[in-house]
From Swiss-Prot:
An annotated GO cellular component: mitochondrion
Region described as GGQ domain: 229-293
Known function: Mitochondrial peptide chain release factor that directs the termination of translation in response to the peptide chain termination codons UAA and UAG.
Name of the molecule in the record: Peptide chain release factor 1-like, mitochondrial
Amino acid sequence: MRSGFLRSARRLWARRAISRMPPPSEELLARGGPLRAFLERRVGSEAGGLDAGSPQLAAAARLLNEKERELRDTESLLHDENEDLKKLAESEIALCQKEIAELKHRIISLLVPSEDMDGSDLILEVTAGVGGQEAMLFTSEMFDMYQQYAAFKRWHFETLEYFPSELGGLRHASASIGGPEAYRHMKFEGGVHRVQRVPKTERQGRIHTSTMTVAILPQPTEIKLVINPKDLRIDTKRASGAGGQHVNTTDSAVRIVHLPTGIISECQQERSQLKNRELAMKKLRARLYSMRLEEETAKRYSARKIQVGTKGRSEKIRTYNFPQNRVTDHRINKSLHDLESFMQGDCLLDDLIQSLKDYSDYESLVEMISRKD
C-alpha cells in the first residue's frame, strides 16, 4: 500500500517535471486531497479545536480556509452583469490566489520535518573517477564551480586539500564550507557526476565519457561529537609537492588516525603544522560524524529517490553533456540547456538545487501521509 502510494506520487512529480508545471505539493494540499486531510487531522477540523502544540501551523491552516472561502465568494461575482464589479472581482481573485499559494508554501515548510544537520557547515570532497586526465580536468572545474557557488551564497570557503595532476587537472580536493543553511543546500550534491564531451586532445572528434565523485559531509559542533584524545594517533612529516622551501625543511604535514575506526585524515595545505592539524581534525570530525549518521540516514531515506550518505555517493546523479549544452539531473528528470552558465556556480545551479529541495520536501510529505494512512 505504502510503496504503491510512493510510486504514484513519483509518477505525478515526473509528469509535472516534464510539463514544467508547479510542484505537486500544492496539489496534495488542495481541498479533498490527501495532504489536506492529513493537515486537518494534524491541527484539528474547523468544528474542533486547533492543536495548541502547533500554533503556527494551526494559524496558517485557519487562514488558508478563510482565504479559500473568500476566493469562492469572490468568484461568484464574475457572473455579475456589472462590468466594473467583474473587473474588481478579477483583481481580487488574482490577489487571493497569490495569497493562497503563499499560505500553502508556508504550511508545507511547517509540515516538512527539518533535519538536525540542515543548519550545519560541511566538508566538500571531490575525487576524479573514470576517464583519466579528462576526469581530472572535470574534477577541477567542479571544484571551481562549488567555490563560485559558495561566493554566490556568501558562504565561507576554505580549501583543506588540493592534489592537482601534472597536466592541470585535479585528482582530489576538499574544502570547508560554512554559512546559513550551507548543508541544507549542498547535501544532495553528493554522488557520481558524469561528463560527456570531446577532449581537447581528441583529434577525431569522438565524445568521451568521464566521471567524478562529490561527497558532502556535515560538520558537527563540539557538542554533537566528542572525540577521546586517547583514540587518536597523530603523525607529522614533511610536506610533499609544490609549496616552496618549507616542503623540504619543515615537518608541516599532519596525519591523524582514529584508532577505533581506522579513519585517516591528512592535511599539508598550510605552512603551519598547527593549522594543518586543525584542518585535519576538522575533516576527521566530519567523517566520524557522517559515519555515525549513516545508519539513521539510511533508514530515513530508504524509500526515497534522492539519497543522502554513502548510498548516494555511489549513485550517478547528474550528466553534463557539452555537445548538447545540457545538464540533466536524473533524480528529478530535469534538464537545463545552458551548461556554460551552469558551471559558473550561480543562479542556474541554485535553481537546480532548489528543485532538488522541493522534490525532497515532496517525498517527505508523501511519506508522512503514507505512514498515517
